């Protein structure tokens, strides 16, 4: 009996997902051994596209540690993210704003998990959970980069948090006491 299997790389997944959206106009993005392009021989994961499809943010092990990369789909090249990635730091779960200016991600640079927003224009990082107790994960940034939502266990269970970067404060989210059957 013959066994058939299908292995999809990030490029393969991107091709399948976006192929239908672009009416069959596929991007042909080769794998590069040293990682100068979108795909490398290292593990690539957690892809997120900007609203207009111009930018793709993802995580890769290509430098020998988990790092965040930004790919310009129109130019078909990686873009630099100065000051974002450093050896020995775990950074993952990226989310990108609609215009590609802001990247929210989870970092363990301070010995605990934090949600950080990187501004590509100013090259600055804002740790929005610096004073929070507990773990945080799975950030998602709004299209304009003002709001960041993520999971937090600071109340003793995993809950959804919403942070407003405009006023630099979490939005109060009252627990819902309803149960659903």
Locate each region found by the language model.
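Sequence signature of WD/YWTD-type beta-propeller architectures
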Residues: 2, 21-181
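Sec-dependent bacterial lipoprotein signal peptides
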Residues: 1-21
